[in-house]
Amino acid sequence: MAEPDPSHPLETQAGKVQEAQDSDSDSEGGAAGGEADMDFLRNLFSQTLSLGSQKERLLDELTLEGVARYMQSERCRRVICLVGAGISTSAGIPDFRSPSTGLYDNLEKYHLPYPEAIFEISYFKKHPEPFFALAKELYPGQFKPTICHYFMRLLKDKGLLLRCYTQNIDTLERIAGLEQEDLVEAHGTFYTSHCVSASCRHEYPLSWMKEKIFSEVTPKCEDCQSLVKPDIVFFGESLPARFFSCMQSDFLKVDLLLVMGTSLQVQPFASLISKAPLSTPRLLINKEKAGQSDPFLGMILGLGGGMDFDSKKAYRDVAWLGDCDQGCLALAELLGWKKELEDLVRREHASIDAQSGAEAPNPSTSASPRKSPPPAQDEARTTEREKPQ
């Protein structure tokens, strides 16, 4: 092994770190020594990796107006959207943890050992009934995509949408007009279902699953009689392979990261914000700030790239705080798209209403399964769900 070069600044500094550690181990002031070591390490990384250097701003101002002007420039050609439950709540779809209205606060009647059990694959295989009872309660029918969903549709229509990464399993992105190629459904989807038997894996469409749910029949495979499960990611299951394959290529070429309606607390989805190059602006539209982290600790722990909205070194991150639909309307207005967006929402909602009216069940038979819409309009719903790391 080559000997360390004492003239190299990093190796010299590293030697000092070792000396400090050796000295500290022999001292009684461990707490004070640990504090000094942390300060020394901060200085080390700042000097060798330019952690503390001021970066040139990527936007002419760190505001929504600055983002809009950037989007209108030649520099912004590929937008990635990262979305969570907050973009679907205005459609009447609850998130999981909001007090009194979140799904976890309304599961007592299912007599679960703990709320999360309803989404655990091991519990589901033994006791599928609570999940399908909940699925019937939550099944949309009347739910429509929101302004946020249609804003992403506009990005697609204008050739700006590179990909939408969604934590939601409600299929509203598809109903709004995004196609399979546009989407990475990180936590799966109700759009398709599969037999849980590894030797079978027969696939079933949403219309088939919808009929079973509304007839209160536990879905069983027509080939082998095993359970059939919607393709949502339960606790204990891996994320779809597409999540990782798209991530590897998409974030090499993204020009703007648009984050909407997510707390950025669920891994590995939350780590996607750190995949964007340092030269890529990031806009958060959410009710509260999210995704912030200590840049030093983030680098040490491999969680670098946290949002920085407020420090003197902020250079690319913008937070618009409030209702997600209102945030999209505000951005659309700055882009000159507001009327186009509002017209799109009205037109699409009218189409959904017309179809729902044509398919409305007879009141005397309302308990019967409803006729399934064609695939382009298929709907299902739960919402963003916390996944274990």
From Swiss-Prot:
- TM regions (residue ranges): none
Q: How is the cofactor bound?
A: Binds 1 zinc ion per subunit.
Q: Which residues lie in Basic and acidic residues bias regions?
A: 378-389
Task: State the EC number(s).
Answer: 2.3.1.286, 2.3.1.-
**Catalytic residues per the record?**
H187 (proton acceptor)
Annotated binding of NAD(+), by residue = 85-89, 95-97, 167-170, 262-263, 286-288, 324
Summary of activators and inhibitors of this protein: Inhibited by Sirtinol, A3 and M15 small molecules. Inhibited by nicotinamide.
Catalytic reactions of this protein: N(6)-acetyl-L-lysyl-[protein] + NAD(+) + H2O = 2''-O-acetyl-ADP-D-ribose + nicotinamide + L-lysyl-[protein]; N(6)-tetradecanoyl-L-lysyl-[protein] + NAD(+) + H2O = 2''-O-tetradecanoyl-ADP-D-ribose + nicotinamide + L-lysyl-[protein]; N(6)-hexadecanoyl-L-lysyl-[protein] + NAD(+) + H2O = 2''-O-hexadecanoyl-ADP-D-ribose + nicotinamide + L-lysyl-[protein]
Phosphoserine occurs at S23, S25, S27, S53, S100, S207, S368, S372
**What molecular function terms (GO) are annotated for this protein?**
chromatin binding; histone deacetylase activity; histone H4K16 deacetylase activity, NAD-dependent; metal ion binding; NAD+ binding; NAD-dependent protein demyristoylase activity; NAD-dependent protein depalmitoylase activity; NAD-dependent protein lysine deacetylase activity
Q: What does this protein do?
A: NAD-dependent protein deacetylase, which deacetylates internal lysines on histone and alpha-tubulin as well as many other proteins such as key transcription factors. Participates in the modulation of multiple and diverse biological processes such as cell cycle control, genomic integrity, microtubule dynamics, cell differentiation, metabolic networks, and autophagy. Plays a major role in the control of cell cycle progression and genomic stability.
Q: What name does this protein carry?
A: NAD-dependent protein deacetylase sirtuin-2
